[in-house]
C-alpha cells in the first residue's frame, strides 16, 4: 500500500481539457483512479518489454533477498509510471512512499523521507527532473552507498556527519529524461521508457475498468473509447467515466458504441481523440495561413494561447498523428490533417 508524503506542496491545477494526459486532483494518488490500478505485473496490461525487464529484476531481487536496483521510468504523462512503482512494491511485498519533486523544497523534506525508510522499501519521486540541486546532491550517497551525509554547522566550523540508511529502492518518474543531470541519471540501475499503448491494449484496459466500475460495456464501445484516448490509459479511464455518467443519467443499462459516440460528442471529442483546441489550431493553419508554414508565436497569438502551452500540450498529439509538421520555417498542416478537417 502506498504511503502518501506529508509535504505541504500545492497540487497543480486540474487540466481543463478532457483529453489532457496530466492527472487531475481527483485522479491523483489516492483519488478516483486508485481502484482501477492493477496491483501485480500479471494484471498490468501493455508495456510488455518493460514488464519483462522488471519481472526479471524483481525475481532476482527476491532470490538475493536484497533491495531492487534504483529504477528510472520516463515517458509521456498518463502512461502508468506511478502505477508501475506501486506494482513493483506489491510484487516485492514492501511499502511505497510517494513524493513529488517540486514539493521537496528544503533539505529537511528529502532528509525526512530518507530517514523514515524501512529496509527494501520503495521511494517514488514523481517529476524527479524538478528536484533542486541540494535535494539531488543529498540523494547521491543515499542511492550509491545507502548513506546520508549531513552538514552540521556553518563556515570553518562546519563538519559532515554520515548516517547509515537501510537498503532501499528509489523509483524516479519523469516526462523529461533529458533534463536529469548525468550524476543523478547514472545512479539508476534500470532506466526504462514507457511507450504509448496500442489500441488493442487500450480496449483491454477499458474493458477491465468497466468491469471494476460495474458498467456493462460492449466490445465495440470499448474500441470507440480506445480510439479516442490518445494512446493513454489515464485518458481512457477519464472518457469511460464520462460515458458512465451519460449512460446513468439517460437510464442506459448496456452501453454500446452509439452511446459512446453520443456521450463523447457532447464533450466535443471526435473519433481520433481531437478536441476543440486541436481542431482550432489545424483550422487556423488552413484558413488563415494556407496550410503554413506559420510561426509558433504567431499561431499562439491568433489562438489566444501561451506559446509554451501550445508547444507542450496541444501540438504533441497532432505530431504523433501526422496532422502537423514542425519545420525550420514554422508549423505546416499535412495532407492527413487537412483530410481530417474536411471529414469533420
Curated annotation (Swiss-Prot):
PANTHER family: HOLLIDAY JUNCTION BRANCH MIGRATION COMPLEX SUBUNIT RUVB, PTHR42848
An annotated Gene Ontology molecular function: four-way junction helicase activity
Upper taxonomic lineage: Bacteria, Bacillati, Cyanobacteriota, Cyanophyceae, Synechococcales
Start and end residues of each stretch annotated as Large ATPase domain (RuvB-L): 13-197
Binding site for DNA: 326, 331
The protein's name in its UniProt record: Holliday junction branch migration complex subunit RuvB
Chief location: cytoplasm
GO CC annotations on file: cytoplasm; Holliday junction resolvase complex
Species per Swiss-Prot/TrEMBL record: Synechococcus sp. (strain RCC307)
Residues bound to Mg(2+): 82
Record function comment: The RuvA-RuvB-RuvC complex processes Holliday junction (HJ) DNA during genetic recombination and DNA repair, while the RuvA-RuvB complex plays an important role in the rescue of blocked DNA replication forks via replication fork reversal (RFR). RuvA specifically binds to HJ cruciform DNA, conferring on it an open structure. The RuvB hexamer acts as an ATP-dependent pump, pulling dsDNA into and through the RuvAB complex. RuvB forms 2 homohexamers on either side of HJ DNA bound by 1 or 2 RuvA tetramers; 4 subunits per hexamer contact DNA at a time.
Region (Head domain (RuvB-H)): 271-344
Small ATPAse domain (RuvB-S): region residues: 198-268
CDD domains, A to Z: AAA
GO biological process: DNA recombination; DNA repair
Composition bias, Low complexity: 1-10
Amino acid at each position: 500500500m502506498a504511503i502518501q508524503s506529508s509535504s505541504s506542496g500545492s497540487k497543480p491545477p486540474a487540466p481543463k481539457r478532457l483529453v489532457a494526459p496530466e492527472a487531475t486532483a481527483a485522479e491523483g494518488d489516492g483519488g478516483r483512479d486508485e481502484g482501477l490500478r492493477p496491483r501485480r505485473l500479471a494484471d498490468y496490461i501493455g508495456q510488455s518489454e518493460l514488464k519483462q525487464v522488471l519481472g526479471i529484476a524483481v525475481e532476482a531481487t527476491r532470490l538475493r533477498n536484497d533491495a531492487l536496483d534504483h529504477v528510472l521510468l520516463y515517458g509521456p504523462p498518463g502512461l502508468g509510471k506511478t502505477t508501475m512503482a506501486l506494482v513493483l512494491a506489491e510484487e516485492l511485498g514492501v511499502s511505497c512512499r510517494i513524493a513529488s519533486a517540486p514539493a521537496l523544497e528544503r533539505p529537511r523534506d528529502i532528509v525526512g523521507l530518507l530517514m523514515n525508510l524501512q529496509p527494501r522499501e520503495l521511494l517514488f519521486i514523481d517529476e524527479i527532473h524538478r528536484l533542486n540541486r541540494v535535494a539531488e546532491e543529498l540523494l547521491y550517497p543515499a542511492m550509491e552507498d545507502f548513506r546520508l551525509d549531513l552538514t552540521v554547522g556553518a563556515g570553518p566550523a562546519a563538519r559532515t556527519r554520515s548516517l547509515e540508511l537501510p537498503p532501499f529502492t528509489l523509483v524516479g518518474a519523469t516526462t523529461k529524461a533529458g533534463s536529469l543531470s548525468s550524476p543523478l541519471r547514472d545512479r539508476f540501475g534500470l532506466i526504462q521508457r514507457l511507450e504509448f499503448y496500442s489500441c488493442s491494449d487500450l480496449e483491454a484496459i477499458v474493458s477491465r475498468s468497466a468491469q471494476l466500475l460495474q458498467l456493462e460495456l460492449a466490445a465495440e464501445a470499448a474500441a470507440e473509447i480506445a480510439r479516442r484516448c490518445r494512446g493513454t490509459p489515464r485518458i481512457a479511464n477519464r472518457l469511460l467515466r464520462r460515458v458512465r455518467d451519460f449512460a446513468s443519467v439517460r437510464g442506459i443499462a448496456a452501453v454500446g458504441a452509439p452511446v459512446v459516440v453520443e456521450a463523447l460528442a457532447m464533450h466535443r471529442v471526435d473519433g481520433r481523440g481531437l478536441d476543440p483546441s486541436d481542431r482550432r489550431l489545424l483550422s487556423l493553419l488552413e484558413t488563415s495561413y494556407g496550410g503554413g508554414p506559420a510561426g509558433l508565436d504567431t499561431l499562439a497569438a491568433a489562438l489566444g494561447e501561451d506559446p509554451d502551452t501550445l508547444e507542450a500540450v496541444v501540438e504533441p498529439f497532432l505530431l504523433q498523428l501526422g496532422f502537423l509538421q514542425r519545420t525550420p520555417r514554422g508549423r505546416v498542416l499535412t495532407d492527413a490533417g487537412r483530410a481530417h478537417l474536411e471529414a469533420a
